[in-house]
Structure formats: structure tokens, C-alpha cells
Amino acid sequence: MDQLRGASVFPKIDLRSSYHQIRMKEGDISKTGFRTRYGHYEYVVMLFGVTNAPAVFMDYMNRIFRPFLDKFVVMFIDDILIYSRTREEHGEHLRVVLEILKVKQLYTKLSKDEVKFLGHVISAEGIAVDPAKVESVLQWERLRTVTDIRSFVGLTGYYKRFIERFSEIVAPLTQLTRKEQPFIWTDACDRSFDELKRRLTTSPVLVLPDSGEPFDVYCEASHQGLRCVLMQNRKVVTYASRQLKNHERNYPTHDLQLAAVVFALKV
């Protein structure tokens, strides 16, 4: 999402029946055969569910859009996100993308200026968490196994840039995933679980940074971890945090503060 800084127009193009737009090699068609009571059938286009289909399709899309990736195009399988600073610039970007699709005979459908992409909602105001993902987190019942914890932490961790002090809040849960750690659900785990849900439902809209404007970086260190927030024009661009490594727990205060500065500058 960092490529989108400074942009304000975000159309998304979805390819129709994406895999079916790639023809099978002649020698592989017979491998897809199946029989029904109506007869024998074989796929002449790439079918959904094949192990290598996503990789093959992604490789093809990356090759045809390679000159424009991270300039004004972001690709994820059959989703093409175009980002532009102005509507005039957007017109040229859209023309280039549509021309490539026309030449390659790929058929599409267009989305609106506010689009959902990789679990985020992107608009001129910034980036927000997809409400559908928030709903799935809210419906999560109490975690009863290490696998449950890893799944929950993995999903909420995907949105950690929206959550201030994420690493500190999640610490009681990650503690239970460590090797040889007995699974004992405590009040601290309950508070962590509930707080992560609350933070996701109240997460801010993160602004898309403008490289031409100054940034403000705020950082903090404690024995609970390192934390920082990147802001621009008094609006949050991203939160970041991490737990301390074992050797860092022995740092004196001034070294911890310096570690927080280094961590913030690497975000």
C-alpha cells in the first residue's frame, strides 16, 4: 500500500473469469478431461483449482504490466489497481492499461473510485480496514488452541499498521504460542483478545503520504516494546511496534530510546 502515497484516484479493474482467459497448451488439454452422463469434456482454457494456476496467471499479468508496476499499477492475480494523483493523470494511466488489455484480449469490469483491495478500502481520504474483515474478527469466539491463537493473531497482525501499541496488546496471546509454554488462558489473554477487537472496530483511516510534505515521527520505548507513529499534517500515516528482543531487555534507558529511533526510521 505504500506505493499509493500522494494518489487520490483509485479505479480497480477486475478480469472476468480470470483464469479462463488463458488458453491451455495443446499437449495439456487431454489432462483436464472429465466424463459426465452427457459425455466427455476437456478444458481448452486454464481452470480454477489447479495448483499452479495462480502462479502462472500472476506471472503473465506481471510480465505484460512490468513497465508500469509500482509507478501507477498494483497487481494481485486478477485485480488491477490503478492509482493517480489527479483525474487528468488518471485518464492517461487508464488509457495505457486499457490499451494493454485490448492488445492482449483480456476482458474486464471496472470498479468505483472507492475500491476494496487486499482487505483494505482505498479512497481519496486514505486507507481503511475492510468492514467485512472487521466483522469476521468480531464473530471470533474465545481462542481454545494454539492454532486458534495463531489464526487470530495472523489476521489482526495483517492490520497492525492501524493499531497503536499492537505488539504490547498482543503479547499475552503470542506468549501462549511459544514452544513448551503451557496453554493457560488468563485474564490478561481475555483483555488482549477483547482489546484487539475493539481497536479494529475503531481503527483510523490512514492517510496516503505525500512525499512533497514534511513528516512527523513520534517514537517511544519501554520494557514492553518499541513503538512509533508516522504522521503528516497531524494525521496518522501508519503505526508500528514490536516486542523487545531478549538482549534488548538489558539495555539502559538511553539505549532503549535510541533503539526506538532506529526502529522508527526503518518503518
Task: Name every feature range the model reports, one short phrase each.
Residues 10-64, 117, 176-180:
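Conserved polymerase palm-domain catalytic core
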Residues 5, 52, 60, 70-71, ...:
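C-terminal reverse transcriptase regions that engage the nucleic-acid substrate
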Residues 1-4, 8, 62-66, 97, ...:
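Metal-dependent nuclease catalytic cores in nucleic-acid-processing enzymes
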Residues 20-23, 61, 66-105, 116-126, ...:
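Catalytic palm subdomain of template-directed nucleic-acid polymerases
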Residues 49, 130, 220:
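Short, conserved phosphate/pyrophosphate- and ester-handling motifs at nucleotide-, phospho-/glycolipid
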Residues 39-56, 181, 232-259, 263:
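A short, polar/acidic, helix/strand-boundary loop motif
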Residues 224-232:
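Acidic, metal-ligating active-site segments
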Residues 1-37, 105, 112, 148-172, ...:
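Amphipathic alpha-helical blocks
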